Structure formats: structure tokens, C-alpha cells
Amino acid sequence: MIKWFLIVFGLAFIALFAGTLYVRLASHDPAQWHVDPETVTEVNSDNQYRDSADVTGDRATVIARLSQVLTGEVVGGTWDSGFVTLVVRTPLYGYPDYVSVRVVEASAEMSRVTIFSRSRFGKIDFGANKKRVETILTALKASPDSAS
């Protein structure tokens, strides 16, 4: 009986370990994940969230601030272009979430920031993507360069 328990437990552990390795080592296809947050059509489901805000500051200033607030591995675009996609990993298991950002200068003093965050795996994210987007936008609005 104990022998079978150990075998089942060992197989379950191996499966969990293999799944964790797959999630952590899965490649990122920019063609699939680097999408324009302003024009993407599938948004605000249970595992993704999109929002935008006007932020005080010219485009270069807002991009510089955003690159400090949002950290992760760039998988598409560049910060300098104002259109970038990053993979951000969850703290416990390292699940990849993709965050696409576009910064457009609305006027000499204002920039429009649009963020689309989504999970690669799973059907629900328990609000993690919404929280991420709202936290980033709040930080940008509260920065010293932003008065609104």
C-alpha cells in the first residue's frame, strides 16, 4: 500500500515539476503576443484586461517613467518606439503574463497610455491583469512628472 502511495506521489510530483518547467521555459512568439493595445478586439475577458489614461508629460518622459514602473522581459517592440510588449511572471509559479503598451503624445503636455495585459495560460486570472494595469496607470498619474 505504501509502495503504491509513493509511486502515485512520485508521479504527481514529476508531472507538477514538468508542468512548471514547461510554463517557465515556453518560448514567446512576438507575432502572437506583440499586439497593439489600442486596436486589439478581444479584451476584458476573465484572463485579460485593457485600459488607458491621459498622463501629464511628453511622450519621452512618460515612456521613461513607464519603463521604471513596468519591468519584465521585452518580447516585442521597443521602449523608444512607444509600443512594447513584455512578459511579466507571477511571483509563485512564474506563469507568463503579457503586457502590451502604447504611448501616444496627445499634446505637448499630455500623453495617452494604453495597456493590455493578459495571461498566457488558464481561463481566469483572479483579477491579476486588471490589478496590474490599474497599478501601472495609478503610478504614472501619481508620478512627479504627472499632475492629473
Language-model region placement:
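Ser/Thr-rich, low-complexity intrinsically disordered terminal regions
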Residues: 2-9, 18-148
